[in-house]
Curated annotation (Swiss-Prot):
One of its GO terms (molecular function) is large ribosomal subunit rRNA binding. This is Large ribosomal subunit protein uL10. InterPro entries: Ribosomal_protein_uL10, Ribosomal_uL10, Ribosomal_uL10-like_insert, Ribosomal_uL10-like_insert_sf, Ribosomal_uL10-like_sf, uL10_eukaryotes. It comes from the Eukaryota. Phosphorylated. Residues 286-317 are annotated as: Disordered. The lineage of its organism: Eukaryota, Metazoa, Ecdysozoa, Arthropoda, Hexapoda. Gene3D superfamilies: 3.30.70.1730, 3.90.105.20. The keyword Lipid metabolism does not apply. P0 forms a pentameric complex by interaction with dimers of P1 and P2. Coiled coil: none annotated.
Amino acid sequence: MVRENKAAWKAQYFLKVVELFDEYPKCFIVGADNVGSKQMQNIRTSLRGLGVVLMGKNTMMRKAIRGHLENNAQLEKLLPHIKGNVGFVFTKGDLAEVRDKLLESKVRAPARAGAIAPLPVIIPAQNTGLGPEKTSFFQALSIPTKISKGTIEIINDVPILKPGDKVGASEATLLNMLNISPFSYGLAITQVYDSGSIFSPEILDIKPEDLRAKFQAGVANLAAVSLQIGYPTIASAPHSIANGFKNLLAIAASTEVEFKQAATIKEFIKDPSKFVAAAAASAPAAGAGAAAEKKEEAKKEESESEEDDDMGFGLFD
């Protein structure tokens, strides 16, 4: 009876995995180290309406995915990343929004002996409030201290753990005595799957403006190289045409070659006084515009002054 129930449960789990991959085009592969059942329940609640969390044994998840490769061969890309204590978070929504929800669900946690430090831990210089009888803890970790007003004072900031270090019993005890909870635990995103593509979660931090700037810089570099080596490309074509047109104008200006676009510059070369006349004609127009603006401002100030005088309040009213 137990075997039948277990077989039925496995079949149900495989069906659930297949249904989720068919329904949701996107998912996160998440690490669940140090995440307790209560925290996991809170995460599921926070994702309600945004995503679905699926946990399970790696062998079962791999087997379910392999059994579904005939219908969706792209899922094979997930298999190398199913290792360690991992699960899936499925979503149809915005990946960055779901990622932010997962980050918000992280909780502070004390250091436990045997845990692996995910980040550097530094004990700041401070008066600990602990009595001299606790000095041995600090000495065991080579932390410089002094006794100040009957309590232990840490003289300098002290790095106590580096990323990847195993937390020892002394470090855990000392951090707990100082009420320092250095770690935060939650579902850590390791890979992102989106409609057959799998990529690092850092890609989600790239904004459209970043892509646009990179693209424009790439086009500019391509155009510069193309112009330098004389190899025409779509990026360099506008610059090549502009440079060619300038060369044509230069040739027309120094020869008898005639074409419509060169007519104006040839006239100016023949009679520079026309250019002076044109410049002189544009100057009064600009001056008249500025004078009109000043006149309008003066009228406005005068109108405001009259309104202030007519407010109807005398000094002794």
